């Protein structure tokens, strides 16, 4: 999953292109703008680091919101990747404009679309949603629903990758944690380069931080995001585990 979070560096707003999987940050950087070229550079850091580890690395799919520059950046970095449009982002604005029973009906039909297991089923449910809309909705809400239904080609590819995420809320959870840290420090105060190092340090700390007592009590087998993703840890002390994992066997020292 991939998304960008806005933040500030000594006043001007910047974007933080972030790649997430398995509850861990896989890539994070800072770019001055959210256009295609800048995001290609930002997400390109993840691509370079992944290929340094596995030269033939190529993700099968990525789930993003509808921002064109994000999707185009990933298409340029990985030409054969399957781009999955986040269904949650597609309906949030619709949800905000509906109330009462009508809101329930709209969300029920959106849920049916999201649960489709094949391309054909997804296309059929989008078509039925589009047919239902003119007789039950009007104005801006109707146009928003029909606009989503017309993007059938962006939603159906998820059926080609059964393991692909259909929503990007997993990346939102990590970005929200990072945003709370940035807010507590009143954002960044020096340069884009130092801000990049700061968000990468935050990402590392998240990946290796030990879970709290309540989670460990309820799920004793879980230790940290790193352990969840890899199924092991190098050392029971989280800081030692971070230092060993990031040492690249001494090659990075």
Q: Could you say what each language-model-derived stretch is?
A:
Residues 180-253:
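Basic, amphipathic alpha-helical segments enriched in Lys/Arg and hydrophobic/aromatic residues
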Residues 17, 88, 100, 200-204, ...:
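Alpha-helix boundary/capping detector
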Residues 25-28, 103, 214-215:
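Short, solvent-exposed secondary-structure capping/transition elements
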Residues 1-4, 104, 122-125, 199, ...:
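Intrinsically disordered, low-complexity regions enriched in Ser/Pro/Gly/Gln/His and often acidic
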């Amino acid at each position: 999953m991939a998304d960008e979070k806005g933040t500030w560096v000594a006043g001007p707003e910047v974007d933080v292109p972030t790649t997430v999987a398995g509850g861990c940050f896989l890539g994070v950087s800072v770019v001055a703008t959210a256009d295609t070229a800048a995001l290609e550079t930002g997400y390109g850091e993840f691509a370079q680091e992944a290929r340094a580890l596995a030269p033939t690395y190529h993700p099968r799919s990525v789930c993003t919101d509808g921002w064109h520059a994000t999707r185009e950046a990933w298409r340029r970095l990985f030409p054969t990747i399957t781009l999955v449009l986040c269904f949650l982002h597609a309906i949030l604005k619709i949800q905000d404009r509906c109330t009462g029973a009508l809101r329930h009906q709209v969300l029920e039909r959106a849920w049916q679309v999201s649960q489709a297991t094949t391309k054909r089923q997804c296309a059929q449910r989008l078509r039925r949603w589009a047919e239902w809309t003119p007789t039950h909705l009007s104005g801006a809400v109707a146009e928003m629903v029909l606009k989503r239904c017309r993007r059938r080609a962006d939603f159906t590819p998820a059926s080609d990758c059964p393991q692909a995420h259909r929503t990007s809320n997993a990346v939102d959870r990590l970005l929200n944690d990072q945003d709370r840290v940035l807010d507590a420090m009143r954002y960044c105060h020096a340069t884009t380069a130092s801000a990049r190092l700061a968000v990468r340090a935050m990402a590392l700390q998240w990946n290796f931080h030990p879970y709290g007592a309540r989670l460990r009590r309820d799920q004793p087998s879980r230790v940290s995001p790193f352990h969840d993703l890899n199924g092991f840890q190098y050392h029971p002390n989280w800081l030692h585990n971070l230092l060993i994992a990031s040492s690249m066997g001494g090659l990075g020292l």
